[in-house]
Amino acid sequence: MIKKIGERKISFSGWSNGRSGSNDFREMYGSDACECISSNDQYTFVFSQVRTLDLIELEQLLQSVGWSRRPIRRVKKALDNSLLKVGVWQHDPKFPRLIGFARCTGDEVIQATIWDVAIHPVYQGFGLGKELMSYVLRSLKDKGIERVVLFADPGVISFYQSQGWTLEPKGNRCAFWYAN
């Protein structure tokens, strides 16, 4: 069970590469793990592209933010075919909890599209979404990606605008087809 972590904002003291390179930490989260530690050292969140996402835990996270349920085999296939997958865990040496997630597709050269971004509702409003987006954009830039497109529900557009994203100006340059 995820506990409420308080009403105040967490200010982050910065990024590190995980417990000074501790082998246990690396085994738990993967070689690319980065910590984001609250300024009062009370909370540690770990961002990783390498740690395997538990599909049941991911499904629970996505349901917590109101996304519709999809068959696990389709979710696994989507993850397998993604350019970038990032998990965010609240660090606990015995039972780390997945509390955030982002997924991107792309051509691996010029353009990427961010399709999925989720932070568990208990952790929203603490700055973790901003940190996750910053991590994703840095990771895409490190891959040489020049342009990033983001699809977002209307209810979260203001969040992305506050992070410097701009809406597509003409509103008619994109079309969708949905299978029944």
Curated annotation (Swiss-Prot):
The keyword Transferase applies. It comes from the Bacteria. Belongs to the acetyltransferase family. Ycf52 subfamily. This is Uncharacterized N-acetyltransferase ycf52-like. Its EC number is 2.3.1.-. Pfam families: Acetyltransf_1 (PF00583). PANTHER family: ACYL-COA N-ACYLTRANSFERASE (PTHR43626), GCN5-RELATED N-ACETYLTRANSFERASE 2, CHLOROPLASTIC (PTHR43626:SF4). Keywords: Acyltransferase, Transferase. It is an enzyme of class 2 (transferase). SUPFAM superfamilies: Acyl-CoA N-acyltransferases (Nat).
